[in-house]
Amino acid sequence: MRHKHGYRKLGRTSSHRKALLKNLAIALIEHNKIETGIYKAKELRSYIEKLTTAARVGDFNAHRHVFAYLQNKEATHKLVTEIAPKYAQRNGGYTRIQRTTFRRGDASTLATIEFV
């Protein structure tokens, strides 16, 4: 049974899931808006909101914390210096998910996730 389980497995091993979320987060930070599957978007929202909250502090330790998750200098720098300061007065809710369409190949629901 999966009662009260904390996250979605997305049909992947833990290392594959970690790499997927890291790559989706980097893409979202670089492009400010991406289109992906609805369940990937919902998992990414949790992942990126925690990173954005940590990055709002803006000091060296925040840089280190975010870099430990992303392993990408450009994305880390952009999140800490450009994106996170915009949300200094906002307590969570930094992203928006909108269902868009169905994928033609397998009819799965797609959604766009973007920074508010």
Swiss-Prot record:
Q: What terms describe the molecular function in GO for this protein?
A: structural constituent of ribosome
GO terms for cellular component: cytosolic large ribosomal subunit
Q: Which InterPro entries match?
A: Ribosomal_bL17, Ribosomal_bL17_CS, Ribosomal_bL17_sf
> What domain of life?
Bacteria
Gene Ontology annotations of biological process type: translation
The UniProt keywords, alphabetically, are: Ribonucleoprotein, Ribosomal protein
Describe the family membership recorded for this protein in Swiss-Prot or TrEMBL: Belongs to the bacterial ribosomal protein bL17 family.
Quaternary state and partners of this protein? Part of the 50S ribosomal subunit. Contacts protein L32.
Protein name according to UniProt: Large ribosomal subunit protein bL17
